[in-house]
Amino acid sequence: MSDSTQMEANAAINEIKKRTRKLDQSLQMRFCADQFFIGNHCTKLASGKSIIISQNSKNRICLRFFMAADPLVGYTGRDFGIAFNQIDHISLKDEQQENPAVLICTLNLSSYTKMCKLQTGLKDVVEKPFLYNKSLARNLTFILKPWNDDPDTFVKISYNDEHREYVHSYDYDVAKSLMFKEVQAVWEQSLKEQLQRRHQTGRVYLTSQLSEMTPREWVQFLADQKLSKIVCHNGSIQYARVEDNPHGRKHTAVATNGFDHRGTRVLNSFGKAHASLATQEKSYAKKRKLTEQSLKLIYRNDRSVWLEGSCAKNLKMPKINSEPNMGEFMGWPDMDNAMTHPTSNFENEDVMKSTKQPNDFVSFEQLQAPPPVLQRQNGAIYSTQSVAFTHISGNDGVEDLTEKISHLGEEAYNIDMANALHAFSDNWHYEIHPNTVHNASFEQLHIGDGNSSIGTIGFNPLEPYPQSSFPQSNNWQQAHGDFTFPQVSFPNTQQGSCLPSTPTAALPPTRPVVEKIPPDTQLFTFPPSGSCTTGMDPVVLLVKDIKTLDRKEFLNDSVMAFMLNYIAFMLSSELMKSVHMCNTFLFVNLTRLLPPLCFSKRRPIEPEHIKIVKDNCPRVLRWTRKFDVLAKDYIIIPINEDLHWLVIAVINPSGAIVDMSNEEASRAAPKCYIVFFDPLSGLDPSKKNHMCHCIKIYLAQLYENTKAPGMKFASKNPTIYDEERVVVTRAENTPIQDNFYDCGLYVLHFIEGLFCYPNRPVNVNDFPNFDWSKFFPEANKMCDLMRDKVYNLILQQADKPARSRLAKFERENKCGLSREGALRKARRHSAVNERRTKRHRDYYARHYSLSPPHRNVMNDDPTFMNPRGLAEMPITRLVRRLRIPEDNFPIAY
């Protein structure tokens, strides 16, 4: 082949590649984002812009999105195009009932750094919530939504052919299939070529860069990213960042050997800047432990004010007179002249409990240093300057001496101790004299070798002590000149450490700050990991959810969802396959924009109302599109409307389907029953008619979209849906609540009673004349104990740290059933006879018992008639026996 022919062939190949590349670049996958998070910072995409996956000009597959202007991260929008080679991992999450679909991209470090450089302020805003794991800030989370009301429009595939653009819409399953089959193959090939260009030899094993996220992994991802789910008024789901907890950082406890329980410890940290003292440590946890233990001021204001009596290990102190007693107060200005300074002995009384007289003050020039045997505590050496007391005589008695110095401990809180403290290393040198005199305007606190400092505010005393020579002057520096500072030495402090200037904190409190448990603290996730949970979404229980189990409180949806999962989890595997537990959002989304009680049969049913329900059906049908719901024997639908819990059980939903190939036998089979359970049972059927009619429309739409001929779960034989075979009923003699706040507990009893009967579950053969009292004769008593039962089940599922957090939260907020039980224990220890064993301190005396009153006396109004009392009235029983049509009765409530 001649050279000219070869050149023509290469030109033709290049032209084909160019056209192919151009055609490939026109192929795009477009997603519509409802929310966009960088880390856990919520921002927005530009108006009208979407998420695009396509090939760039270099024929590399890339992710492209246009970020809108955000005042926190830059006032200008920016178009980002990130090649897949710069992405570590991509996760896809399908819709799970009310939870939307999600696309998560984890950037590698280089692409994240470039993105932060392009967008001013992005790094500071995104990394601020993730001090311990900044890699979480590299997650791009896109909350997806359909392009329109049709749920099958999650992704748009567009391409150009002969200068014409074609656009097709598909559901999320098609988008996921394209990502795993097409995009992943191109992505892996691109990574292999990149490794070959870098001349890396040997076989390369590439791990999967694309994965599907399970519901449990999504719950854990939200917890790691500090995001919380918010249910909007229209039933949609939004996500928001959890507010930063002011008590989130836990202080490192300081050892208290030698302290009694009456002492009060106050720990003050110098701030975040003190972390620079431990920059040589490899672990952040080690840095934090070192800095928190070494840079905290410890104040004592009780009888145990003196530190533990032990000298520095390798430091020989000269003896003065004899071994000092516990009440001996002594000191010296330096090592050479230690014997020339007098000492004073006094009784170590509680100096804070004496009454301080007005105008009492002691000058720091007149204070004597504490004894050396009281210098070391928790590895820190404390020393103060030595100035003799002018108002204390060695001949004074204990009472006189105590009266004279009783103001010292209290007066120490009238100044900022940080202004009078010098910190130096454990092995301080003798040439650094403790009696070094500083000017009164001294504004630095020295650390380590004395060359490093942090800024403080000058000392400003209140008023002079009456017996001292301290002159009364507003300017203490002019009147008194120089004064000395007490000194504090911290061990293991790095030499030459430097801390920035910080303003002096407020006066130290008299008791340590107690860290409270925030209400959003997570307890556990149910069902447990590793269990077979097909069709069961995990539920995260928070501390605030358990508070709804208190007396006279309404159960929230989290506790209800936990119990639904628990009941389903405890069923046998065969029975579980025939049960579908809907979540509490199904009926809310099904009746969105629907007028209240429009199907109550008290007014004509309008076609537009039926159309509203049918339009809402695709939203909830997406949640169960992966399995055949009508093939189940039980469909449990919990409902919360107007702060009231109800439940509807669809028994034998396939009974509404007629097999036309054997119509006679099919119509002779058991029908479909919609059983309505209302613990606030009255004579008015309006709510029952309205809710059950909505469920009938839902079942009809469910058949048309899943079981009709040509659908995904259609039968081989021709079938039709017969609405006449759907019977609305209610069980007889069901328990009725005797208050207006236990409705959720009764609903749990109804759901549990359908499956947990000792002999067998309730089946379709028990209807329509099903008597609940025959199965559960003591149903009312069982419902009254349901609150304690749910609480105990939660404690069983929680581990020990979770139970500890819950108990602490209940003590802080004075709530919880466990607190009520602890208070009732006092009655067990109220025996008349003398005790042989000492009463435990957790048990209170009888007159301190706060047990709640009996249920019969809890009603404020003695004439109050509860729902159960109304249903048990003789006139009510007579009306029910007459079986007068319910539609003729007026509204009872």
From Swiss-Prot:
GO cellular-component terms in the record?
A: cytosol; nucleus
Please list the residues that make up the active site: 644, 678, 743
List where in the cell it is found. Nucleus; Cytoplasm, Cytosol
Q: Which domain of life is it from?
A: Eukaryota
Task: Report the gene knockout effect.
Answer: 64% of embryos arrest in between late gastrulation and epidermal morphogenesis with failures in embryogenesis occurring during late gastrulation, epidermal enclosure and elongation. RNAi-mediated knockdown results in arrest in 29% of embryos which display a range of embryonic abnormalities including increased bulge formation (humpback phenotype), epidermal enclosure defects where the ventral cleft fails to close during embryogenesis, impeded or inhibited ventral neuroblast cell migration and irregular cell shape and positioning.
Main location group:
nucleus
Keywords recorded for this protein, A-Z = Cytoplasm, Developmental protein, Hydrolase, Nucleus, Protease, Thiol protease
What EC number is given for this enzyme?
A: 3.4.22.-
Biological process (GO) annotations held by this record are: adherens junction maintenance; protein desumoylation; proteolysis; regulation of cell-cell adhesion involved in gastrulation
Q: Where are its TM segments located? A: none
Spell out the PROSITE patterns in the cross-references: ULP_PROTEASE
Q: Name one GO molecular function term.
A: deSUMOylase activity
Q: Where is this region: Protease?
A: 538-800
EC top class named in words: hydrolase
Q: Which PANTHER family match?
A: UBIQUITIN-LIKE PROTEASE 4, UBIQUITIN-LIKE PROTEASE 4-RELATED
- Spell out the family assignment given in the record's similarity comment: Belongs to the peptidase C48 family.
Report the protein's function. Answer: Protease that catalyzes two essential functions in the smo-1 pathway: processing of full-length smo-1 to their mature forms and deconjugation of smo-1 from targeted proteins. May deconjugate smo-1 from the cadherin protein hmr-1 and plays a role in its recruitment to and the maintenance of adherens junctions. Required for epidermal morphogenesis during embryonic development.
This chain belongs to the protein called: Ubiquitin-like protease 2
Q: What is the scientific name of the source organism?
A: Caenorhabditis elegans
